[in-house]
């Protein structure tokens, strides 16, 4: 429990965004072949930080930076095995090898990011595994954060506290800019007393997520150095 609100260190937040320590969807990631393959641990008894919402945040950052996420393929509900009874990971490695070799052998004039998308194997499908029956089944569906789909039924994704408080799915704001609370922003109706209490709790204001990060930081490039060498160092 944290008894009072606190702010992240301003310089550390800015550096994290500028250096890509907080994942940026453009730059090198724009031309990277991405297979996001994971087991589902959102319902783990003691909780698990590896919630699948984060893969959708990555997808949102790719789309924000590049206008698409066609270089990313998601599969959920996999089993981490190489045997005939549990072939998931072995199959994924074969698909990745095929994808990377096709990119390497592409001698066209397209830039790398376009080559990555153009050479994605047709057999590398997006979907989820239904492990509920005697025979496992791959359900071929685009993976989405919220949808009326079989995969979302099997593997529901849950928002982070920040997303629940109004942040975008990209979840890429470290320190928000503040504005005065407005009771009309909420789905419930406040009494005058409750509105006064809301104002009293958030004396400094609440997040205005539409304004982006308070630092106004922008990604500076890949493999940036923190020094002391001046070579490729953060500005």
Regions found by a protein language model. Name each.
Residues 1-235:
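C-terminal His-loop and adjacent cap/lid subdomain of alpha/beta-hydrolase
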